């Protein structure tokens, strides 16, 4: 019988003594558990999402994949430099549960810093968790709009599963459509139909 390898000690983070730029944040790398985001130069740590949450994001990606135009691609759980601060100043980076980005950005993300830029992203998607409702519906809503991300979808797994589709409305930020349950259908930014109930496993 082969023994399973024992996990090593968790990587210890040095708590920064100053507000971080995007470059400093990217240099921190990944944590052993949970994930981080950067908000006005402050590292915000969150626990790892639940299995149900991650499965819903994965199932959403599976439904989207065959419906995306060839120039678009989806990615789960990756940092986005929101570009809300000049280089060298305290930065903003969020990690949407799923994003739809222009395929041409993938090579740069893979080769360079592993981080999308807000201008690469067409749709940011957050799956609401019990501890993230206000952040997803209000804080990220405003940050993604300020960053110029054209579309933001908020998926709430509270039954019945719902999706709120937000789109840029000029100087007013996002305009939010009414929450949809059952099947979400739209023609913008591309024709898509999503069975929301199928996001529950």
Predicted regions and their residues:
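Gly/Pro/Ser/Thr-rich low-complexity, intrinsically disordered segments predominantly at protein N-termini
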Residues: 1-201
